[in-house]
Amino acid sequence: MEYERRGGRGDRTGRYGATDRSQDDSGENRSRDHDYRDMDYRSYPREYGSQEGKHEYDDSSEEQSAEDSYEASPGSETQRRRRRRHRHSPTGPPGFPRDGDYRDQDYRTEQGEEEEEEDEEEEEEKASNIVMLRMLPQAATEDDIRGQLQSHGVQAREVRLMRNKSSGQSRGFAFVEFSHLQDATRWMEANQHSLNILGQKVSMHYSDPKPKINEDWLCNKCGVQNFKRREKCFKCGVPKSEAEQKLPLGTRLDQQALPLGGRELSQGLLPLPQPYQAQGVLTSQALSQGSEPSSENANDTIILRNLNPHSTMDSILGALAPYAVLSSSNVRVIKDKQTQLNRGFAFIQLSTIVEAAQLLQILQALHPPLTIDGKTINVEFAKGSKRDMASNEGSRINAASVASTAIAAAQWAISQASQGGESAWAAPEEPPVDYSYYQQDEGYGSSQGTDSLYAHGYLKNSKGPGMTGTKGDPAGTGPEASLEAGADSVSLQAFSRAQPGAAPGLYQQSAEGSSGQSTATNSQSYTIISPAVLKAELQSPTQPSSSAFPPATSPTAPEAYSQYPVPDVSTYQYDETSGYYYDPQTGLYYDPNSQYYYNAQSQQYLYWDGERRTYIPALEQSADGHKDTGASSKEGKEKKEKHKTKTAQQIAKDMERWARSLNKQKENFKNSFQPISALRDDERRESATADAGYAILEKKGALAERQHTSMDLPKLASDDRPSPPRGLVAAYSGESDSEEEQERGGPEREEKLTDWQKLACLLCRRQFPSKEALIRHQQLSGLHKQNLEIHRRAHLSENELEALEKNDMEQMKYRDRAAERREKYGIPEPPEPKRRKYGGISTASVDFEQPTRDGLGSDNIGSRMLQAMGWKEGSGLGRKKQGIVTPIEAQTRVRGSGLGARGSSYGVTSTESYKETLHKTMVTRFNEAQ
């Protein structure tokens, strides 16, 4: 360890010292002693300079400032200068001088040695994009340094002047950071390593920051990162000596503990296949590098970026349904508090890091990439606070779950679809497929004692919110699959090639449409078949796949819509009169609560369709959702039904009743409803668009009442167009039913609300274990009675609804039964007052406020006391009767006047009236004036 003794300034006077010199020395000796080469020019650490002495002796400081990290480096200028001085010094290695006094050493160097030192200094300085300025004036600021930079035409990223933390004064040095190394080198060469700031020469040096040593330690038991001074693990309590595991420099915990890409998957998880690769687009090496998720921030949470502001949680869950089994508790959409729209990103949290890594790898390997509501989604690991990222081998083994099985199975379908290239989709003969994944899945499900993920299939001939098919092949040789995610999600046709015994459930396709010209005209629906239906199909292999289901609906060509740009919520203007946001580009009004648009010209509510990139009326969507089924039902009817035309207020009133019931049934439907495969199609079809259409009608009625204008909506259907059947809200179609059906369909309609075969109440959407429990539910359940009352009211006519509402209002009104009794029987006479037992003598009424107004009588207590002492009325008081005769009267004075002041009293007493007081006052003032 280096140690150098530092003396005072008076000691550094010369080579031979100042105390032993005689005063008779010649002038030549004096001039030689004061030669500049005799001075000690060693660079001692100053207050504003490097604190390297501190760092030489103590390297364990945990809190180092930024300026110390810049200066306290092994290759700093001062240390280099000392090493060169010791190298050229004849005294030998660094340490104490031989004679014990540094003043006995000759520190003078020749001119050649100084030039050699400068050359070595320039060679040893390593170029850096950070330049250090030393010997700055105390008055110099950052602006002065920036002025020097601007004068040379150089742009710096940051200029930082080091100041004292307590006083705020400059410490005499600063750092200038450049964006590129070339800029720093060019500036140093242009100024020849020196500057002139405020008339003072400033030296310039390359800064070499000291690398920070990772002093934290990892516990090899639980994987938690602990601070340096902690002697025991924060989580498991294992001592540091037993559980210490040093982190290599530049690495992180998650890079060591997390196996990705299927290289070190734990037992119980399905192996990940190779990611999908489109031929001619990417090489296998480039795709494997790009698709592998980065493990730098690996955790159990994934972030979805670039979301549509109108995307909901249902659309996100639907887009991710082919790859993972998620619920609303796994997804969190970040919304704006003011507009209630999402802020463009959402988080997906899974149970383990392994599952999150598998899902991330699947989503990043999709080609085309994942899209939700027409926008391409960027998928990454979420960057959060420090958490427990590592897990032991046993916890990773227990991380196998149904979600990871579904992820691996979905990615297996993608890899199987990509093995044969694009030509494999149209091959008439299907190549043999390896079903080891499904067999492994079956074994896992049996070991857990539950059915597999695909054991229950309930979606028949329907489009899920996040799964839509592509065009069908007219020859039946094989559908042309689309590997788009989100709205056009990954095709699951590979599941239809699986063996019967491979999995309890099976995906099946029903190709529809006669012409395969475009993917927009025809649609292909995917059906999940329950085991019972699958068994019936296997018994008759020659039967077509669609024979086990109701006849497929014929697809219809979509109507032509105008294309619009994606709505930009930031350009909307708030309208105080309507409470909506006005879109200046389209002229529509936006409702942030329902996320729908209102057209003031056509008086219609619209919603944004990301697939068609246009605004679609809400009523049109609700009617189109049931158009195909209604067409097939009308072919069996010969008579035409009458349809009622309702105003917006009436429809909004009807929808308001149903909105209340829907909100109550949502939680019951999610928690207690067990799907039944034999339910009717119209009861099973739950369209989010139709639900939004009903909710928006309620908003329309509220807007109409606020503007006090009647807005007549177009007819729900024309005479030659059938009425839409019941969908999610089965009672709304009853509003358009004929009156004849309403009269005859009361008990029959209520009977249809119960499925006795499945022991289920279709109205409450609940299934019961026995018939007695179902009957008890119908008789005693308050929820069933409430839903039944809403169902009955929904089928009433307008007159009946008005009468029922009037009756309800009368019942809710307060009934004054006392007034009814008085009107019927009259008011009874008041009872006679009770008679007193002893009748007292009626005394004359005396004004209690002025008892002495008329003077004092001889019957008062004071007069009787005086009479008892010998006083007689009319005589004065006192022993000799020399006192006053008349009693003293209280007189009023003018407020604020003294006792003896003139005009303070006008002879008015307190018992006189206002008129008498005014008269006496006038008389007194008149007498005083004379």
Curated annotation (Swiss-Prot):
Zinc finger (RanBP2-type) boundaries: 212-242
Pfam families attached to this UniProt entry: G-patch, OCRE, RRM_1, Zn_ribbon_RanBP
Acidic residues compositional bias, start-end: 59-70, 112-125
Modified residues (N6-acetyllysine): K383
Biased composition (Polar residues): 507-522
Gene Ontology annotations for the cellular component aspect, listed alphabetically: nuclear speck; protein-containing complex
CDD domains linked to this entry: OCRE_RBM10, RRM1_RBM10, RRM2_RBM10
Broad class of the protein's primary localization: nucleus
PROSITE patterns from the UniProt entry: G_PATCH, RRM, ZF_RANBP2_1, ZF_RANBP2_2, ZINC_FINGER_C2H2_2
Biased composition (Low complexity): 540-562
Function: Binds to ssRNA containing the consensus sequence 5'-AGGUAA-3'. May be involved in post-transcriptional processing, most probably in mRNA splicing. Binds to RNA homopolymers, with a preference for poly(G) and poly(U) and little for poly(A). May bind to specific miRNA hairpins.
Oligomeric form and interacting partners: Associates with the spliceosome. Component of a large chromatin remodeling complex, at least composed of MYSM1, PCAF, RBM10 and KIF11/TRIP5.
Other remarks in the entry: RBM10 transcripts also code for an alternative open reading frame (alt-ORF) coding for the MINAS-60 (AC P0DW27) protein. MINAS-60 and RBM10 ORFs are overlapping and are formed by shifting the reading frame.
Protein name: RNA-binding protein 10
Species of provenance: Mus musculus (Mouse)
Lineage: Eukaryota, Metazoa, Chordata, Craniata, Vertebrata
Gene this chain is encoded by: Rbm10
